[in-house]
Amino acid sequence: GKVETAITAWKNLLTSLKAQENSTPLIKLSQVLIELWQPSPQLSSEPGSLIAKNLQGWFRYRTLKQLYQVQKNQPQLSILQQQEQAIAQEAIYKLLLIGTLPVLGGIVGVGLFLFLLVQFFVRGDRALLSINKTLAWETPWNVETIWQVLIAGFFFVGQVALPLLFSFVGYNAANLNLRGQAIYVLVSYVSMAISGLLILYLSLKPFFPLPKDWFKFKPLSNWILWGIGGYLVALPLVLVVSLINQEFWDGQGGSNPLLFLALKAQDTFVLTIFFITASVAAPIFEEIMFRGFLLPSLTRYMPLWGAIVASSFVFAFAHLSLSEILPLTTLGMVLGFVYTRSRNLLASMLLHSLWNSGTLVSLFLLGSGAG
């Protein structure tokens, strides 16, 4: 490897650390790293615990290996190699699990989608894939109310009001540990959801009682089948669109900061908070806003298929990641189709929850092998 380049980088880091307060452990670690790769290392103390505490993954293994080789500590070197072999085997099992389950689900999804296509060509308007082009919700409000709910209830509250409020009270999430950041994510999202739903309620209150079929929750219907079936079909569709999308963005996709935190988290409490946020709170709030309110409202101005596409695009745009608009629009279209066919928000909420849960589980399994 480029040892000289690495040593130069560590020396530069050491210089900058000496100018900072509360950086003593990192200063000691930098000194150890520089000394370990010298031709004749002179270690003033036993740095094993310092390395184990401050380095992770491959960096910890490589540094400890160098330390034990310098010390000629063959017993510890053998133990380290055995540990790394066990970690490597565990990582292989996890990668197989992460890769196999979505592939199996995708295969089932492709089969289900092909079956639905054949049924559509054979049965026509009686098929599950058929969309009643004349279907429209009775919508007493106009486009001004639609924009009011979206702009004020979703974008303004989430992107302007809440950040300003947290900044005003001096709350900086960057200074928190992982548990603190997890709680911050949950509190900020739930606050946005409650505020958004309150604005939705106040905006629609003048039109009470609402016409039939608005915001339907039917727990005794077949919503579970619609949710699971929609999830299986979404897997291959979103995967194909994502692969195409990669070509446009040269692999430089956006990223939800929640996913990055979840990748680092190996704390049950933190993961539980992330699960509540992504797999419970987000599906409930976003399905009420985008499938429960926006999609039906748009049927006043366009056919049902147009409302599904338009609401899906707004849903994707609301995630504020330009490079992920195509995959998220595809997911939104599946969510919209499931909702319009089932006429039950529980179905799209289940699909949404399964999607987010699958992402979190994959990141947890990947992150658990990083230590």
Please name every model-derived segment.
Residues 192-196, 274-277, 328-335:
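Hydrophobic core segments of transmembrane alpha-helices in multi-pass, intramembrane catalytic enzymes
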